[in-house]
Amino acid sequence: MDATRAFVKDVKRVVVKVGTAVVTRSDGRLALGRLGSLCEQLKELNSDGYEVILVTSGAVSAGRQRLRFRKLVNSSFADLQKPQVELDGKACAAVGQNGLMALYDTLFSQLDLTAAQLLVTDNDFRDPSFRTQLTETVYQLLDLKVVPVLNENDAVSTRKAPYEDSSGIFWDNDSLAALLALELKADLLILLSDVDGLYNGPPSDPRSKLISTYVKEKHQGEITFGDKSRLGRGGMTAKVKAAVYAAYAGIPVIIASGKATDNIIKVIDGQCVGTLFHKDAHLWVQVKETGVRDMAVAARESSRRLQAVSSEERKKILLDIADALEANEEKILAENEADVAAAQYAGYDRSLVARLAMNPDKISSLAKSIRVLADMEEPIGRILKRTEIADGLILEKTSCPLGVLLIVFESRPDALVQIASLAIRSGNGLLLKGGKEAKRSNAILHKVITSAIPDKVGEKLIGLVTSRDEIPDLLKLDDVIDLVIPRGSNKLVSQIKESTRIPVLGHADGICHVYVDKSANMDMAKRIVLDAKTDYPAACNAMETLLVHKDLAENGGLNDLIVDLRTEGVTMFGGPRIDALQEFNIQATQTFNREYSSPACTVEIVDDVYAAIEHINHHGSAHTDCIIAEDHKVAETFLQLVDSAAVLHNASTRFCDGFRFGLGAEVGISTSRIHARGPVGVEGLLTTRWVLKGSGQVVHGDKGVVYTHKDLPLVAQNS
């Protein structure tokens, strides 16, 4: 739960207002899918004991659509050529309200929920006795678990444009919802719109940023409103006025998108959805917003200073970090042991504890990988291509850093070291967010690494994010963060991809396969299969599925593999063909799409290499897959047709690793089908730019310029 939304745990009575742009489609017809999703969410809240009040718009738009259609079917061709008179809104409201409420009644009844309609006008609220009776009626309906559905009775309203009148009662359904929230003593008001929330500019402008928490003193003068919605009366301006009115009266308000199918549930769960208006927001939001943005900006500034130093100086920084890791081994291991003990006490899964643990060999290996990285060819400013555009006009394509990276990872503190060293080698700024289970390990490693960075670059080159609540704010900073790399569970990767406009690089699963062909050397096959599964079962490149040619089930080869795996303590789950062979006594698997991350794997029999390829391409995660075969034609078929980031022949899947591939280290393994695929080292953290060197040439309509477009040899790099 986001810290700014912690108050929702005490919410019981909720007013939900849904706007015309959400209730209707672009053609004016009612949006059945969105309304169905809305009703399902309200049903869920009702079943969980919440008291839900719905304020709805859409009657005028729905009625206008019906009347236009009726007029169209009853018009002659000559009538259609005449200027069309806009239909009266009050008549539209009278026609549309009936159909709108009938739809709500149908949808709620399908969910075993009852709705009640209440129509009000602004004049009604001038009468204190009306307010009292309205409150009593709504309370009675809530006690009966009925959903009150309120709307302004536009058909008989005496108010005319401009709708915001001096009486200050209400002038649209946003202000009506705010008024009702106060009258009915609601704990929360949710205003559903056709955009994700309040932006500091028009939502269509890519430079506009979503404001997660509105602070009047900060944002009032910064916001530029765009056009109002296509059908509604007030647009975002009206929503903000209504939200400020309710919030400062003590009722929290959240403006969120009504087009998402689960935003109401997310709001109630305390997720950072939409824009929050809260009377106490000015006390706690500014420090947090400033902190994460300043951290990202500082990382960018430090990265530019890092790029400005010489290649030898960057190399020395890495060597100093490697030395510092070894010099501080005892401190690092002491903090790591505390994390491991806490994780075991908390009952964390064994695979997570295994990834969390460090030892002297791991620290030595990390230091070694950093030194290998330091000795690699300078990656920044490499000339990748030279072209003579015209006489005296030379174009160069050069490598350069991406900018600022945000890495979100779980449980593995050694990942922090690898990522930090790669960021420094590639000239990038870095923000790191590790899992809470490795909090102490990450803190000491971050301190050791940043202490080795010279002042001329600045230790803010690498920032450590310590609060989970800051992640949603970081994911909104697409103007200062250039790439997000999540390393962890499928759930983590998926959540991040859904929550940001920043490019995301990574893999969600590591469902790696080993296929043993009938031509395989079985002694080799046993070694590779055991290594792929047992060397480090929690690794993302560990074998999760063993596929075996059908002939090996008949000649004893499969039995030997199963015996060896059992001897090493591996639990096996069989596919349908294994399950049919009772002699192996293997429990049937429920799915082939499972990453165990533990001493367990799936085993299945396939007819041939083509069946193995089809299985891998269908059930795999495009990570790492291996064939064991002596038949080179079969092996080449496998290597060419398996669509994975790394494909191996007669070698363990555990070799798919940045250090083992000679990359020095890896920031992660990407299964995305982009430039960076497989283990991502320094090159995956670089982009390119064009440098054009001329001698006074101008385009001038391409007159006087003779284009040659001649490839030129690359020149030696400057250090």
UniProtKB/Swiss-Prot annotation:
One of its GO terms (biological process) is L-proline biosynthetic process. Residues 1-293 are annotated as: Glutamate 5-kinase. The keyword Oxidoreductase applies. Expressed at high levels in leaves and is inducible in roots subjected to salt stress. Pathway: Amino-acid biosynthesis; L-proline biosynthesis; L-glutamate 5-semialdehyde from L-glutamate: step 1/2; Amino-acid biosynthesis; L-proline biosynthesis; L-glutamate 5-semialdehyde from L-glutamate: step 2/2. Residues 294-719 are annotated as: Gamma-glutamyl phosphate reductase. SUPFAM superfamilies: ALDH-like (SSF53720), Carbamate kinase-like (SSF53633). Substrate binds at S57, D154, N173. This is Delta-1-pyrroline-5-carboxylate synthase. The lineage of its organism: Eukaryota, Viridiplantae, Streptophyta, Embryophyta, Tracheophyta.
